[in-house]
Amino acid sequence: TVHLRTNPALLAFFKENPTVILDGELFVRGKTLQQLSGAARMEKNAYDCDWLQYWVYDCYNSADIDMIASERYKFLEDKFAEAHNFPIYRSGEDESEAPIRLLGHEYVSGWDNMKKLHDEWVSAGFEGAVITDPSKPYKVGSRCNNLIKIKQYKSEDFKVIGYKLGLRGSEDMTFTCELEDGRTFEAMPVGNREIKAEYVENFETKYKGHKAECTFFNYSDDGIPTQPKLRIFRFDLE
């Protein structure tokens, strides 16, 4: 990522705004998470990762910790994008080839409108949507309802052929699920301790060999479900 960290315009921005931390991620539309994370870990050959882009969507200013989201985005538009000639990507526009850009925000209210934008962005090659309360300050190192991620997960049924206990036994167990071609993947079941303990206790007689519904974000380059969760066994399909 040398081409990003040594970008002259980015260095100039930080020199002018030493108390600001940019919040963004490495992303290239059309590339899978597996491809992006693999390129980001490269150290020996910078040319193999010089296609990575840095998308900025928020910032934190230690000199003004009460700056609300709408003010932070206006700051990024004026002091980051306009002042240093970083492009702003807005939905529906042609995408710039610039390695660093600001992701455009859209004001929206109501779940139906949020879902509409989410679906539009996913169909355009993005992962989902992030909803931010424009009247709230940036929260560092904590989860809060100021920022909510929306991701539409896929759902399919897979045969369960085994299980693995975790470091805490059944509490962080995973089920071994089988794909149509015989390959397997691990999926963590949804449920409390009692449910998971029951899964282990009765696996051989009740669950082994049966279909279960798994939700997952997408398929990896190798055709394996990513971020899989086993939601429920589908005895009704048998």
Model segments located where?
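Covalent nucleotidyltransferase
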Residues: 1-94, 238
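Nucleic-acid 5′ end/cap handling module spanning
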Residues: 42-46, 59-62, 81-238
